[in-house]
């Protein structure tokens, strides 16, 4: 599909055409990952130049969005939240894809450090990941690192626990506002 804005359920979604970066060979994945940043910046500038966001959520992989995050954070004076799914490039070293002495490692490690610096908050998948990130990145303020798991165990609740709208009122969320759960 070409790059463009689509409507779905009342939400405007910017779809960006990219190279294949999943389930492909390492060369295509590498080139595609490096091109993502410029493809997203171009699409955002073309389709959402006048749109303002208060919060920018982004996840890893990829870690190659530094310029996108820096540009948008400055343009909108937005808060940024990194959802850290993979600790890259260390996981590539662990998988034997390249060594810590390689040019690729140094390049991606530099991008990783800059992404952490740009992020107002960093959500890690587990307490162990939080510890790892802080141990290997002493420049990060521990106050901005927290646990943000992919899922949580659901608690059984009785259907009649709360009256409709009670939680929204409790959280000071206007009932007329659209609510997104990510």
Spans of model-derived segments:
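An aromatic- and histidine-rich active-site surface loop
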Residues: 29-45, 53-78, 82-91
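Structural motif
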Residues: 54-55, 121, 179
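Acidic anion/phosphate-binding donor-loop and adjacent secondary structure
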Residues: 134, 138, 143, 151-169
């Amino acid at each position: 599909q070409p790059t463009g804005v689509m409507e779905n359920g009342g939400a405007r979604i910017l779809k960006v055409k990219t190279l294949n970066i999943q389930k492909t060979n390492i060369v295509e994945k590498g080139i595609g990952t490096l091109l993502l940043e410029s493809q997203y910046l171009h699409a955002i500038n073309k389709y959402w130049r006048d749109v303002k966001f208060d919060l920018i959520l982004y996840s890893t992989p990829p870690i190659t969005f530094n310029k996108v995050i820096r540009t948008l954070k400055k343009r909108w004076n937005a808060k940024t939240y990194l959802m850290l799914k993979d600790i890259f490039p260390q996981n590539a070293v662990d998988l034997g894809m390249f060594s810590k002495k390689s040019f690729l490692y140094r390049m991606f490690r530099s991008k990783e450090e800059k992404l952490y610096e740009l992020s107002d908050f960093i959500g890690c998948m587990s307490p162990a990941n939080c510890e790892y990130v802080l141990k290997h990145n002493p420049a990060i303020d521990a106050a901005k690192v927290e646990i943000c798991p992919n899922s949580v165990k659901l608690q059984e609740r009785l259907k009649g626990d709360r009256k409709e709208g009670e939680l929204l009122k409790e959280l000071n969320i206007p009932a007329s506002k659209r609510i997104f759960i990510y």
